[in-house]
Amino acid sequence: MINRKHLSQNIAFGLFRLLSLSVVGILFAILGFIIYKGVGVIDWEFLTSAPTDGMTSGGILPAIVGTFCLMAGSALFAFPVGVMSGIYMNEYAPKGWVVRFIRIMTNNLSGIPSIVFGLFGMALFVNYMDFGDSILAGSLTLGLLSLPLVIRTTEEALKAIPDSLREGSRALGATKLQTIWHVILPMGMPNIITGLILALGRVSGETAPILFTCAAYFLPQ
């Protein structure tokens, strides 16, 4: 009986290892194919020049600069707003239907297609607020797109911190704000940063919001 259990356990572990190695192998195969096919055409001129001949040749410098600007702008918007929202929901908001409703709405926002955010950003930032097709409009739109993930990650990171640390800090005379700033946030910050990186990784690959709010193919002269 024991040998049978060990056998089934070893088979299960072997399958898990095989599946894990298969996933890693596929990932490395894709990366290897991309590097093999691209190493011959990627050079310094390709990375530092603008596209030419109707986007059929030239370089990708505007795309690189635009991506970094959009990521920085969206992080500047999503990080403080998302972290403060997560702190409020976990540390200050009374437990009740209001918080549950906000959580449901936040989860629903995470599932909205990016094209909806793009249309919303075009209507609000580009047209109504008259930002035009700009980095600012695109950054705010991508910030809204990444906001639900940052909020949920912040809330879950703060939930994982034991209440004994909060109680110990308060027992030493610290205020609630001091406890959050000096005890809770430093402990939860690694997970919060991880959530922000995941959110930025998601929005960096979105095309619909960029197309509707800030699509540009050349750097300003």
Task: Go through the PLM ranges and name each one.
Residues 51-58, 210-221:
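Interhelical loop and adjacent transmembrane-helix boundary motif
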Residues 75, 176-214:
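Transmembrane alpha-helices
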Residues 25-28, 32, 80-87, 119, ...:
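Membrane-embedded alpha-helices of multi-pass transport/permease systems
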Residues 1-18, 34-74, 95:
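Periplasmic/extracellular loop-to-transmembrane helix junction in inner-membrane transport proteins
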Residues 113, 172-173, 186:
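Glycine/proline-centered hinge or cleavage motifs at structural transition points of membrane proteins
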Residues 74-106, 119, 127:
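Transmembrane-helix boundary motif in ABC transporter permease subunits
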Residues 107-145:
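Generic hydrophobic transmembrane alpha-helix motif, especially the helices
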Residues 65, 69-77, 81, 85, ...:
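Hydrophobic alpha-helical transmembrane segments of multipass integral membrane proteins
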